[in-house]
Swiss-Prot record:
Subcellular location: Virion
Other known facts: The gene encoding this protein is included within the N gene (alternative ORF).
Recorded GO CC terms: virion component
Annotated family: Belongs to the coronavirus I protein family.
Keywords annotated in UniProt: Virion
Pfam families, per the entry: Corona_I
Origin species: Bovine coronavirus (strain OK-0514) (BCoV)
Top-level taxon of the source organism: Viruses
Free-text function comment from the UniProt entry: Structural protein that is not essential for the viral replication either in tissue culture or in its natural host.
Protein name according to UniProt: Protein I
Coiled-coil residues: none
Length: 207
């Protein structure tokens, strides 16, 4: 610090020179953009990014030109007395892409969408469903009858009374099934099928 108080020599100036490293032009390039007035530091491999930006700007300008071209064609036909209602439909279909109003090209893929059928699908007919429902109570009643016979042999008075009433109602329902089928006809599958005869059940002892 003592040398700073006296006269500055050329050797002292060389000590305070900032070290500037020479830049390799192959590693760093300065490209000026005259439209925006900015400098973009570009390294190797980023030239493709700038070319992509240029192509994107050109595509946007082409979209605007396409939109203006369609509107100018409609204005020309409107003054000649020509019906212009079908012109917007014919012009986009002539090409493989459609120029929308916002300047974006969209591919026409409306025909590729799957068409779903709105018709209801029936898994099984009502006749087979009725037949299946008829077989369920019959199996249940047969199991209940066997349980009731065991309880009657054990001698529980209250259980025997309640089961006797239930079994009698079940037998009555089974006997009325043929009459109900004739009174309320259903699918031909159920009508043509003969009703199986009901097996004789052992008479229950009275309480």
């Amino acid at each position: 610090m003592a040398s700073l108080s006296g006269p500055i020599s050329p050797t002292n100036l060389e000590m305070f020179k900032p070290g500037v490293e020479e830049l390799n032009p192959s590693k760093l390039l300065l490209l000026s953009n005259h439209q925006e007035g900015m400098l973009y530091p570009t390294i190797l491999g980023s030239l493709e990014l700038l070319s992509f930006k240029r192509e994107r700007s050109l595509n946007l300008q082409r979209d605007k030109v396409c939109l203006l071209h369609q509107e100018s064609q409609l204005l020309k036909l409107r003054g000649t007395g020509t019906d212009t209602t079908d012109v917007p439909l014919k012009q986009p279909m002539a090409t493989s892409v459609n120029c929308c109003h916002d300047g974006i090209f969209t591919i026409l893929e409306q025909d590729r969408m799957p068409k779903t059928s709105m018709a209801p699908t029936l898994t099984e007919s009502s006749g087979s469903l009725v037949t299946r429902l008829m077989s369920i109570p019959r199996l249940t009643f047969s199991i209940g009858t066997q349980v009731a016979m065991r309880l009657f042999r054990l001698g529980f008075r209250l259980a025997r009374y309640s089961l006797r009433v239930t079994i009698l109602k079940a037998q009555e329902g089974l006997l009325l099934i043929p009459d109900l089928l004739h009174a309320h006809p259903v699918e031909p599958l159920v009508q043509d099928r003969a009703v199986e005869p009901i097996l004789a059940i052992e008479p229950l002892p009275l309480v």
